Each structure stands twice: as structure tokens, then as C-alpha cells.
Amino acid sequence: MLLFLAQMTLAQDKMINISVNGGVEILKYTPEIGKPKPGGSVSVECQFQQFLTKNFGYGAGIDISYLTANYYISETIETPITDETDAGIPYTLRTIFDDFNEKQRSFLVEAPVGLYARVPSRYVHFIVGVGVKVGYPIVAKYDYSRGTVETRAYFGDDIDAELSKIPQHGLYKQGTNAGDIDINRLQLSLYSDMMWRFIFKDATPIHFGAYFSYGLNDMVSNHDATMGIHKNSILNSTLTDKIVPICIGLKLGLAIPLEKGVKRSIFDGFR
């Protein structure tokens, strides 16, 4: 046992990984109408890694991420209004989306913690890891980036009339709108990444790899806004259910060695 512990101590590698990541974000949900479209994912990551043995270790760090996604619709929603109304009689609210696109953007800080395995060789180390990320959104915004949304009131039966462009009664045509997304302040996700670390002259490690993350909880805090009445993001509307963010992409960066065992300094490289 003492011999094993001694070998474990001598095998330890400590390093700081700094990566720039870029890829695609997909918001997974099934709206009643329209369809989500992918956006972009860009992040900067700084992670401490320690390999307790030659092949296994752990990592913990911090990410700063900027994510975008889109929602597209070109349809008409008809909602019966049967409660007491300003007109005194029931009517049908028509919400007309004409080539409409909503863009969602979020900026968040995440803390990944995971387990890592590596297969070392003289010039290349292959490393793969899995873990959990805890995220805190700093900003979450939406804007109508294309098309228009218009609300009209249709009175059927003997009246057979349609009213529009009466903003004081919620009937309007709008080409632009922007605001905050009511987002959950705690974002949890599973992540996996892999990288090839290329070593030159023992101490200049460049890594290249890929990453994937999958959200565990609903991205937003509510789904109670009626599109066309409340000027909210589609993500907070009654047209959507659970919103799950998915990110996939590539990463490129450097690793800074800190120490190897008890006799290694920052200048001693990787072998």
C-alpha cells in the first residue's frame, strides 16, 4: 500500500488548460407551431487538471460562454376569447406571424467539474473527460430579428368583422421587439470533452479537441405568456414545454504544466 501511494504521488501531473471553444447551440423543445433553429456557441475556458495516476485524474474550472439560438414561424394562431371582453361578446384572437424569426442570446458563467482519463505517448496525449457543469446566466435576451407579428380580433356569426391596429385593446402590428427572457438562475448540464495534446520540446503543449453538453433542467423559469398578447420570448410562451440547451463544437488551446510529482517545476515540461 505504501509503495502504491508513493508511486501515485510521483505520477501526479498538475496543469492549467486554457481553451477557446466554438460550435453550435441547439435548444431542444417541441413548440405547438413553428420550429427552433440552431445558433452559435462561443466560450473561453480555464480549467485546473490533476492526474493522480498515469491514466486517471480530475478537473475543475470556469467557463464564460455566449450562446445564441433562433425560432422561426410563418403561421396564424387562432385563440377563442370567451371570457368577459371589452367588446362584451366573445371573439377569436388571431395572431399572425409573417416570416417571423426570434433570436435568443445568453451570456453565462459555468463551473465544470469532471473526471478524466488519458492515454499518454511521447508526443501526443489523448484525454477524454465527463462531468457536470453548474451555470449562472448573467444576461438572457431575445429580439424579433425578422418579419412581423400582428394581432387581430375576429367577430363571427352575424357580425363577421375583423378589427386590427387598436393598440389600447391589444391589437397591434409589430416588426421589432426585444426584452429579457425569464430564465432559470441555475443551469445544470452534463458535459463530455476529448482532446489531443501535442507536445513540442517537452514544454509547449497545444491541444485540439471537441466538446458536448446536454442540459438537465428547464432553461427558462415559466411558460405562461400568450404569444400575441404578452410581448415575451417564445421560450416563455404557452407554445413551448421544457427547453433543453445542447451544445457541440471544437476546442483549441494550451496547457500550462504546474508540477509533476514532488521534484518538478513549471519549467520542466511534460516528460
Where are these regions (language model features)?
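Extracellular/periplasm-exposed beta-strand and loop segments of Gram-negative cell-envelope proteins
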Residues: 28-38, 67-106, 137-187, 219-228, ...
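N-terminal signal peptide c-region/cleavage motif recognized by signal peptidases
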Residues: 6-8
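Outer-membrane beta-barrel "beta-signal"
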Residues: 244-271
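Transmembrane beta-strands of outer-membrane beta-barrel proteins
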Residues: 16-20, 58-62, 109-111, 126-134, ...
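Start-of-domain marker
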Residues: 13-61, 65
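Transmembrane beta-strands of outer-membrane beta-barrel pores
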Residues: 22-28, 64-68, 107, 132-140, ...
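Transmembrane beta-barrel domains of outer membrane proteins
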Residues: 47-49, 114-118, 195-197, 251-255
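Outer-membrane beta-barrel channels and translocator barrels
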Residues: 13, 51-53, 120-124, 199-203, ...
